[in-house]
Amino acid sequence: MISIQGKGVSSGVGVGPLYFYHRTKTEIPRYTVTDPDAEWHRFKGAQTAAIEQLGELAEKARAEAGDEAAMLFETHQMMAEDLDYEEAISDHINNEKMNAEAAISDTAVQFAAMFESMDDSYMQARAADVRDVSDRILGILSGAVQGGIASDVPVLLAADDLAPSETGQLDKSTLLGFITAGGSGSSHKAIRARTMGIPAIVGVGDALKPEYEGRPCIIDGATGNVVIDPDDMTRDYLLKKREEQLRLQRLLETLKGQPNVTKDGKSIRIYCNIGSPDDVHAVQVNDGGGIGLFRSEFLYLNSPDYPTEDQQFEAYKKVLADMNGKEVIIRTLDIGADKQIGYFNLPKEDNPAMGMRALRICLTRPEIFKTQLRALYRASAFGKLGIMFPMVTSVWEVREAKKYCEEVKRDLKAEGIPFAEDVQVGIMIETPAAAIMSDRLAKEVDFFSCGTNDLTQYTLACDRQNNDLGRFYDPHNPAVLRLLKMVTENAHKNGIWVGICGELGADLTLTETFLAIGVDELSVSPRAVLPLRNAVRMTDTRESAPRLLAAIDAEFPETL
């Protein structure tokens, strides 16, 4: 029996033979060209063919699995014709006289490195997208045939890595789960596995040997454990665990439509975090009570230029209308120097996490901010909208932002354009400054939403993307929990509500703590709604609150 440890990114137990993904590798020729125009036309021809392929794949994915599955290929279409991407390839061909293949390859390396250097895990995962798009164009230039799964029976798939489009084309009927050498929980393969409801493990490194192919294997997506040639005891244990997981999933399905109320009658709202209008379907399927965080950056990241007011309005309107009266809280632009978008022309900064980003950009470039606010207020006529400002550190920033809101509303009224008068305005609490000033900030807004990812990072002075700091980056640290408790108390003293929209909101080991603190809303990924509802309904705060509130004041996080 061989046991390998990785990182589980999609829960479940998979049992079957191990199969290695066979990918056709394309050698990249490099030579100096004498006719750059001809080389550019070679690239453009392959680019056009790639865009057509991606369109066909998007339609196939939509027919088989809905809009959410199709979105990956549509995003790749936009990336393939991105002006910055094209310009970089053009520079290599025209200025350095590179052949098309070398120009595409070097551009992919350059863009992937840029994404990987960013602080945001979502943006880091985009490195795989640009590699994938480039590989598709290179494959067309070389005439290479894409690899795939050639097995006739369901298998556990093993690979060094899976490109986003490869993940998107996986057929659930032949896939029991997959294991990759690299990857993260925010990668496309992890998201796709969770969408398909199959177990997945990433980060096993070079532990999977070619000689393991075809041998019996069991994977546990919850623990990240891979067992090859399992003995009877291990096999029986994991099979029983799979049955228990299936039983729990059936139980969770019965919770749809049930209230989020503890045994002693304390209620809490459970909302969802989304990144595009296509995610609304997942919110509805998983019975989310609303949307607590709609990241509006997708409009800017997927556009070759600043999105217009009408483009933004249509996107916001669609989400509000689709949510059918349920609350939708949209976060204003959270672009920063660590999320470079070419047309923003942001300067390179040594410390982008503390540089020009989010609300700071909006307040220094009011034309961008006002365009977004106009689109938001126009969309408010079609549903229950809340507007949320990110990365706040002071009262004056909030007052300045609110001035622009009032200015936009006056303009819309003068133009006879309808909008809702009762739009709530809130802020994200994700800096220690905002937490410390929460008693004053609470007088300025209608709600707080705590972004625990950045709040933990800034409070502990610890880069959450640095794996070497894993033991020091602890969201359970009493310093973080005390700040959340203080923010909640200050919010309630001033008659406003408070929520949590970071990853910590879905941490079931802290659900009782958040209920004890008095948090009013938890906003999580759609798939986390029902497990969180179950945890809430199993809690009795009369018993747990005194113990947990005392633990927050403890010296060591282990007491929690």
Positions of predicted regions on the chain:
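Non-catalytic, soluble scaffold/interaction modules
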Residues: M1-D322, V328-I335, R365, Q372-L373, ...
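Conserved alpha/beta-domain cores
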Residues: Q249-L560
